[in-house]
């Protein structure tokens, strides 16, 4: 009975996709326009593409595009995309795929996504290479990211000054630990917070050391020595109260926003795109937050990581593959498009060569909020070559889920397992697939 119910739901979803596909085919724009269907799970991304369609239509008046955007809930969109690719019906022309789900579309040898490598070949040296590697398999690029996700440390300067600690003196994680002890002693507040239901803290810190869940050859390294030692380091800082588990489990929870907005901790490690969360959910910190590189694990070590991400893809089964690819290259591969990624979305663009452009220095809500707001991209330019690639494997989504759901909670929150035990168990589950 359960199997019949599942089959019925899948058939109904397929029928919905077919009907949606037929509707898209029947609807046509003005004479000379080609309609492209775009699926996303983030309504904000639609704003960016609306702007880029306007720019495209100005530049190519004889090849105008009408964008039909469908915004689905996160899980539904990824499920719909998988089913439509299998069925060969109702396939969008372009679609967003979030990092944690991307590996699901790279399985096997017959990858259903168009090769985007030629789109950026001419200017490849202008892109942050780690973010191209992230969405590649066997040397072919299958998605263009929406940002670099340069990971930094956000310091609450009110707390830091009260403790007599200068963030510019923090060069290594040991420096951070020592500074945190002083912050705790003087102010009674933790130096930072650690996510226990999301991997931002842990993954950034192991990526700094050129580690991850898989190596470049697809070998599982989730429980290697680097990862075990890093998780132990976080556990030690929690136990000596230098850091605490993030209220609500992560840095996107209402509990955390309220805690941090009241000056709850001296710092938080997150990608630069987290600026938007400060503005939207922590208004009382305006003018108090300074952005700095991450501490390195040793003097001269890497001071950043590339975190999070949503890549835009072109399914091979799109009815307008070539046009969709050209538009995607224009939107996310051009200098103009990369400047829009900042001005419309507040994201650090994939092309580092626009980071020093005047458009990225103009005052806006981001520059106004942060203490060193007008120098944000000066910080990022200084660390752009210190971002190591994260290698996606077809089991990356499962590995990520295990880390978020079990490893971090068991090792850091409940501490019912040692870091080694938690990572060994997760690695064992992945090997049993």
Swiss-Prot record:
Q: Does the keyword Amino-acid biosynthesis apply?
A: no
Q: Where is the lipid attached (S-diacylglycerol cysteine)?
A: 22
Q: How does it sit in the membrane?
A: Lipid-anchor
Residues covalently joined to lipid (N-palmitoyl cysteine): 22
Positions of disulphide bridges: none
The alphabetized UniProt keywords are: Cell membrane, Lipoprotein, Membrane, Palmitate, Signal, Sugar transport, Transport
Q: Does the keyword Zinc-finger apply?
A: no
Signal peptide interval: 1-21
Listed Gene3D superfamilies:
Periplasmic binding protein-like II
Where can this protein be found?
Cell membrane
Supply one GO CC term from the record.
Answer: plasma membrane
Induction / repression: Transcription is repressed by glucose and by the binding of AraR to the operon promoter. L-arabinose acts as an inducer by inhibiting the binding of AraR to the DNA, thus allowing expression of the gene.
Q: What PROSITE patterns does the record point to?
A: PROKAR_LIPOPROTEIN
- Sorted alphabetically, which CDD domains does this protein's record hold? PBP2_TMBP_like
Per its UniProt record, what SUPFAM superfamilies does this chain match? Periplasmic binding protein-like II
Q: What happens when the gene is disrupted?
A: Deletion of the gene does not affect growth on glucose and arabinose, but it has a negative effect on the ability of the mutant to grow on the alpha-1,5-arabinose oligomers alpha-1,5-arabinobiose, alpha-1,5-arabinotriose and alpha-1,5-arabinotetraose. AraE/araN double mutant is unable to grow in the presence of alpha-1,5-arabinobiose.
* Protein family according to the UniProt entry: Belongs to the bacterial solute-binding protein 1 family.
Assembly: The complex is composed of two ATP-binding proteins (MsmX), two transmembrane proteins (AraP and AraQ) and a solute-binding protein (AraN).
Cross-referenced PANTHER family, in alphabetical order?
A: ARABINOSE-BINDING PROTEIN-RELATED, POLYGALACTURONAN_RHAMNOGALACTURONAN-BINDING PROTEIN YTCQ
Q: What role does it play?
A: Part of the ABC transporter complex AraNPQ involved in the uptake of arabinooligosaccharides. Transports alpha-1,5-arabinooligosaccharides, at least up to four L-arabinosyl units. AraN captures the substrate and delivers it to the two transmembrane components.
| Protein name per Swiss-Prot or TrEMBL | Arabinooligosaccharide-binding protein
What species is this protein from? Bacillus subtilis (strain 168)
């Amino acid at each position: 009975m359960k199997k019949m119910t599942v089959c019925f739901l899948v058939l109904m979803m397929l029928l919905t996709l077919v009907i949606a596909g037929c509707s898209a085919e029947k609807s046509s724009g003005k004479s000379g326009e080609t309609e492209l269907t775009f699926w996303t799970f983030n309504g904000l991304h639609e704003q960016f593409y609306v702007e880029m369609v306007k720019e495209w239509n100005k530049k190519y008046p004889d090849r105008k595009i009408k964008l039909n955007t469908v915004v689905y809930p996160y899980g539904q969109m990824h499920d719909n995309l998988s089913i439509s690719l299998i069925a060969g019906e109702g396939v969008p022309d372009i679609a967003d795929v979030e990092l944690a789900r991307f590996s699901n579309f790279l399985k096997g040898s017959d990858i259903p996504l168009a090769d985007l490598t030629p789109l950026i070949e001419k200017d490849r040296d202008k892109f942050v290479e780690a973010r191209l590697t992230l969405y590649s398999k066997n040397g072919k690029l299958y998605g263009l990211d929406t940002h670099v996700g340069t990971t930094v440390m956000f310091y609450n300067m009110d707390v830091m000054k009260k403790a007599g600690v200068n963030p510019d003196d923090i060069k290594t994680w040991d420096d951070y630990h020592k500074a945190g002890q002083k912050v705790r002693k003087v102010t009674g507040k933790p130096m930072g917070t650690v996510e226990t239901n999301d991997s931002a803290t842990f993954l950034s810190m192991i990526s700094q050391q050129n580690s991850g869940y898989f190596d470049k050859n697809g070998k599982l390294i989730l429980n290697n020595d680097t990862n075990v030692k890093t998780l132990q380091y976080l556990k030690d800082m929690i136990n000596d109260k230098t850091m605490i588990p993030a209220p609500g489990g992560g840095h996107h929870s209402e509990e955390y926003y309220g805690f941090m907005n009241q000056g709850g901790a001296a710092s938080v490690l997150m990608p630069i795109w987290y600026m938007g969360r400060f503005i939207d959910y922590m208004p009382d910190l305006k003018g108090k937050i300074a952005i700095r590189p991450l501490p390195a694990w040793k003097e001269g070590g890497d001071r950043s990581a590339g975190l999070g991400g949503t890549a835009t893809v072109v399914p091979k089964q799109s009815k307008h593959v070539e046009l969709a690819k050209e538009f995607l290259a224009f939107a996310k591969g051009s200098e103009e498009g990369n400047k829009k990624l900042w001005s419309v979305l507040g994201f650090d663009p994939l092309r580092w060569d626009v980071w020093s452009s005047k458009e990225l220095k103009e005052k806006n809500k981001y520059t106004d909020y942060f203490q060193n707001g007008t120098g944000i991209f000066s910080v990022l330019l200084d660390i752009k070559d210190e971002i190591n690639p994260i290698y996606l494997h077809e089991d990356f989504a499962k590995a990520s889920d295990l880390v978020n759901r079990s490893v971090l909670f068991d090792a850091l929150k409940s501490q019912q397992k040692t870091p080694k035990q938690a990572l060994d168990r997760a690695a064992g589950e992945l090997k049993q697939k």
